[in-house]
């Protein structure tokens, strides 16, 4: 199974347009949205080509493939615009015998680990900083932000395919800063 992960689009049609190109190239079986879909929040500058309504339309195209969790900037108003559920604080996906705990990161994250078994991949966004590391028997995975990357990072997303987890450049799909790991 191939899964494409992204987070923190914050209503940027520019970022979602680039993501659409990556989805077409990657051809994922499942798309995981790790929160903060439409609103930029009071702490972030407006992202490139901010348009929450158009962003919702762009995301709804993939409504049958998306599993999403609620970010700290997501609200019931956002849910009214999106045609797939976004209001859960977490979800779990099993792929190729691997458990993924999906959350935005403002509640559960590498510093506040949920009660999960060793070997689980904790996938979250929120920080806008891509991460792929092992900690206390878990894999901590953050695909970064497609719209408002922080700490001098570029826009990124993530891919799970054939037992391999990676962070990739939104611009061209290349492996980002050697963030790739075999998970067996």
Name what the model sees in each region.
Residues 2-95:
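Core catalytic region of metal-dependent phosphoesterases/phosphodiesterases
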Residues 6, 70-72, 102, 124, ...:
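Alpha-helical architecture
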Residues 9, 20, 37, 55-56, ...:
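Functionally constrained cores in energy, signaling, and assembly domains
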Residues 10, 40, 62, 104-106, ...:
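Histidine (H) residue identity feature
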Residues 40-43, 76-79, 101, 110-112, ...:
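Short acidic/glycine-rich loop or secondary-structure boundary segments that cap or lie
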Residues 99, 106-178:
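Conserved beta-sheet core of the metallophosphoesterase superfamily
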Residues 183-184:
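Non-catalytic terminal accessory segments
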